């Protein structure tokens, strides 16, 4: 890429990716807050799938499930790859802090996407991508296990959930890119499919606390989970992937640990340590390189 048009395309894709990152970072904080109430991971998943599924049924009825483009395996990757991370991340948050979620779910997911894209989409794992990931990974580790963090066994359980969530999301990304689905179309297939599969099971599940939780807590989760995260962020993410490619578009997710740390300043009054500021700088530089920033175009 070297023309002004290419630069404009990159900036458009980067803007979509950055907006998605802001929503994802907020989702991690809000999900953690929800789990501090009597809401369970099952309740939060029901709110996400129920709200998003109902809102997107009319759109999916017009567009269809695109099985001719996805194939049955691709359809399964979209539905399950969109649903599984919700459960995996929410259960992980029961064991490990939000910083680990941000670092190991969206933070490591771009590496999974790059490896799968090289295998299934023939996207080159270029020198610039290798350099970018070499910058991102130390930053992710520094935020997750910096000073004051430990490798407690219970946290390790949560970390495994977060990594599994990232891998599931990577399969969603590859299926969407391979079928060239729009972000909203993929979000609709995932949301409606998840709603049809999950809500009948949830209706007979013991231990739900939705009826006893304050309406403000329920409304917050419904809006953030069902509208912002399950619909808007997937639209933005899909646009970034369609413009920049699977691995380059997904690279913006690695900014989530840094964005979460920055959001914690005004929301939680938690200031990053000097090491975390350094990690934020490393991650930001790595994402810029992997995503195809102008200075790396000549090396791709």
Which residues fall in each region the model found?
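Specific alpha-helical transmembrane segments that line the substrate/conduction pathway
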Residues: 43-54, 81, 90-124, 165, ...
């Amino acid at each position: 890429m070297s023309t002004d048009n290419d630069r404009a395309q990159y900036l458009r894709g980067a803007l979509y990716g950055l907006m998605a990152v802001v929503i994802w970072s907020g989702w991690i904080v809000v999900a953690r807050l929800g789990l501090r109430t009597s809401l369970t991971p099952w309740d939060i998943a029901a709110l996400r799938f129920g709200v998003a599924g109902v809102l997107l049924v009319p759109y999916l009825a017009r567009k269809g499930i695109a099985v001719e483009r996805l194939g049955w395996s691709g359809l399964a990757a979209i539905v399950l790859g969109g649903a599984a991370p919700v459960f995996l991340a929410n259960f992980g948050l029961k064991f490990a802090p939000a910083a680990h979620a941000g670092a190991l779910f969206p933070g490591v997911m771009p590496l999974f996407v790059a490896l799968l894209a090289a295998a299934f989409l023939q996207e080159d794992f270029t020198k610039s991508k290798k350099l970018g990931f070499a910058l991102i990974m130390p930053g992710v580790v520094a935020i997750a296990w910096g000073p004051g963090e430990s490798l407690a066994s219970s946290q390790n359980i949560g970390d495994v959930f977060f990594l599994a969530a990232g891998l599931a999301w990577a399969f969603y990304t590859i299926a969407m890119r391979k079928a060239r689905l729009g972000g909203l179309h993929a979000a609709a297939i995932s949301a409606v499919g998840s709603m049809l599969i999950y809500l009948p099971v949830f209706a007979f599940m013991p231990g739900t606390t939705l009826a006893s939780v304050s309406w403000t807590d329920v409304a917050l989760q419904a809006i953030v989970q069902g509208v912002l995260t399950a619909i808007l962020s997937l639209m933005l993410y899909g646009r970034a992937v369609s413009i920049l490619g699977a691995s380059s578009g997904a690279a913006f997710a690695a900014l989530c640990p840094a964005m979460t740390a920055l959001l914690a300043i005004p929301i939680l009054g938690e200031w990053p340590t000097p090491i975390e500021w350094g990690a934020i700088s490393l991650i930001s530089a790595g994402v810029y390189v992997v995503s195809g920033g102008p200075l790396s175009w000549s090396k791709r």
